[in-house]
């Protein structure tokens, strides 16, 4: 329901499919994706793919960590698809705690942690996800002004230790 307030003059409907769907995310997409066994659509596109005989919705996206994938999988197929990606494509599977450590080491913000409705994306480290060529999004004028005049007041920083490297493992 909260998406409706961000929808401006679009002819669309929303459906909560979370009961029967699981989302799998792939970060640090390797350059060679032939081992996946399916073709990736262009970045920014959604496609229906078959993974190990199971139909999935796939979003190929760009993010602050580089190219990535989001897979929507029927909940009954999720474990098999995850196993396939781990064994066939050689992708390591990590839990929530390991992922949180990975993103914090790289100063990557997350919704519910560093990002919320009151968060300025340029101050949170999510500026790379803002497209300044696109039209009309909520807060666009404020963000564009901060960017144009280089007036960002805060940025994530490392208090100690050495950088982990962008998208590294």
Ranges and model annotations:
Residues 1-169:
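Basic, glycine/lysine-rich polyanion-binding surfaces/domains
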């Amino acid at each position: 329901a909260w998406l409706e307030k961000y929808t401006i003059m679009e002819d669309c409907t929303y459906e909560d499919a979370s009961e029967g769907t699981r989302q799998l995310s792939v970060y640090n997409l390797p350059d060679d994706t032939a081992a996946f066994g399916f073709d990736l659509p262009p970045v920014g596109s959604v496609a229906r793919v078959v993974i190990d005989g199971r139909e999935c919705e796939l979003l190929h996206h760009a993010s602050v960590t580089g190219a990535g994938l989001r897979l929507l999988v029927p909940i009954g197929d999720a474990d098999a698809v995850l196993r396939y990606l781990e064994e066939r494509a050689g992708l390591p599977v990590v839990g929530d705690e390991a992922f949180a450590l990975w993103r914090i080491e790289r100063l990557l913000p997350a919704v519910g942690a560093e990002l919320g409705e009151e968060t300025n994306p340029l101050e949170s480290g999510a500026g790379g996800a803002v497209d300044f060529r696109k039209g009309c999004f909520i807060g666009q004028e404020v963000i564009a002004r901060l960017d144009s005049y280089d007036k960002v007041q805060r940025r994530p920083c490392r208090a100690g230790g050495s950088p982990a490297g962008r998208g590294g493992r």
